[in-house]
């Protein structure tokens, strides 16, 4: 009787929990699908616009978020 209870518990509780897709996984998948739909010109435009928005580092402290500007 105990073995039957364990088998029922596994199939009725644990197996459905293991096969459920988590809601947290779905936005990441949608984001990846949306990125794949971009053509190469759109990707290039996004990258170039991001590179143009860099600013000079204050007080000469250069790091990856800004460019070292002399003058």
Swiss-Prot record:
Pfam families: Conotoxin. Residues 25-54 form a propeptide. GO terms for cellular component: extracellular region. Contains 3 disulfide bonds. InterPro entries: Conotoxin. It is found in: Secreted. The keyword ATP-binding does not apply. Expressed by the venom duct. Is mostly present the middle of the duct (part 3, 85%) and just after (part 4, 11%). One of its GO terms (molecular function) is ion channel inhibitor activity. Disulfide bonds join 56-68, 57-66, 62-69. Keywords: Amidation, Disulfide bond, Secreted, Signal, Toxin. The modification Glutamic acid 1-amide is found at residue 70. Residues 1-24 form the signal peptide. Belongs to the conotoxin M superfamily. The cysteine framework is III (CC-C-C-CC). Classified in the M-1 branch, since 1 residue stands between the fourth and the fifth cysteine residues. This is TxMLKM-021. It comes from Conus textile.
